[in-house]
Design a protein with these regions (language model features):
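Hydrophobic core of transmembrane alpha-helices in multi-pass small-molecule transporters
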Residues: 40, 109-110, 116, 122-143
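Helix-loop boundary and gating motifs at the non-cytosolic
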Residues: 12-89, 96-107, 111-114, 171
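Hydrophobic alpha-helical transmembrane segments
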Residues: 72, 106, 124-130, 162-195
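Alpha-helical transmembrane segments of multi-pass membrane transport proteins
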Residues: 45-46, 77, 139-140, 152, ...
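Intracellular juxtamembrane helix-capping segments at the cytosolic ends
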Residues: 53, 140-155
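Loop-to-transmembrane helix entry/capping segments in MFS-fold secondary transporters
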Residues: 64-65, 96, 155-167
Length: 195
C-alpha cells in the first residue's frame, strides 16, 4: 500500500468518525427537544387534571375525609413504587421502555377517571376515584429514577443546568396557563350543568 493510499484511508476513517459523531450529536439534540416538549405536555396534563381533582371529588360527592384519603394515598403510593422501579433497573430493565410504558399508563388512566360519573353508581364513585387516582400517582412517580438516570446520560454535564432551567421554565409557564384555562372552563359549569 502506498503512502497516498494509507493517507486517503486514514482520512476516510476520520470522516466516518466525524459523521458518526455529528449524527450522534443530532440525535441527542433531537431527544433533548423532545424532552422539553414532553415536559410541556406533562405540565399541561397536570395543570388541567391534578389542580382540580379535589373539586372533581367534591362534585362526585366526596367528604372531607375522602378527599384527605384521595391525596394522602396518592402521595404515599407514588413514591413507594419508585423503589420497585429501582429494583427493575438494577435487574437490567430498559430505562426507555420503563419510562414510556409508565407515562402512557399515567396518561391513559385519566380516561376512566373522567368516565366515573357516566359508568358507575353514585355510591361507588368516590371509592373508584381514590383507587384510580392512586394508580395515576403510581404511574406518575414510578418512572422517576429511570427518567433521571436516562436524562443524566443524555444531557451533557456542561449544559445540564441551562437545559433543565429552560425545560423547567417552559413547564412552569405551561402549568400556569393550563391551570388558569381549566379554571375558566370549570367556572362556566354550575352544579346543574354537571353530569
Amino acid at each position: 500500500m502506498t503512502a497516498t493510499a494509507e493517507t486517503k484511508e486514514r482520512e476516510e476513517k476520520e470522516e466516518t468518525k466525524q459523521t458518526q459523531a455529528e449524527d450522534e450529536a443530532t440525535k441527542i439534540k433531537k431527544s433533548l427537544n423532545y424532552s422539553i416538549k414532553d415536559g410541556a405536555f406533562a405540565s399541561a396534563m397536570g395543570g388541567i387534571s391534578d389542580s382540580y381533582l379535589p373539586a372533581y371529588a367534591v362534585t362526585l360527592g366526596a367528604s372531607n375525609r375522602q378527599i384527605g384519603l384521595l391525596t394522602s394515598l396518592a402521595n404515599l403510593f407514588g413514591p413507594l413504587f419508585q423503589l420497585s422501579s429501582l429494583k427493575m433497573l438494577r435487574k437490567g430493565a430498559s430505562r426507555k421502555k420503563l419510562v414510556l410504558i409508565a407515562v402512557l399508563l399515567h396518561a391513559l388512566i385519566l380516561i376512566p377517571i373522567l368516565a366515573i360519573p357516566f359508568f358507575f353508581p353514585e355510591k361507588y364513585r368516590v371509592a373508584i376515584l381514590i383507587v384510580l387516582f392512586s394508580l395515576y400517582a403510581i404511574f406518575a412517580n414510578f418512572p422517576g429514577p429511570a427518567w433521571a438516570s436516562w436524562m443524566g446520560d443524555l444531557v451533557p454535564s456542561k449544559v445540564r443546568g441551562e437545559y433543565f432551567g429552560r425545560r423547567n421554565r417552559i413547564a412552569g409557564v405551561v402549568t400556569i396557563i393550563t391551570t388558569l384555562l381549566a379554571g375558566l372552563v370549570l367556572n362556566y359549569f354550575t352544579k346543574d350543568k354537571v353530569f
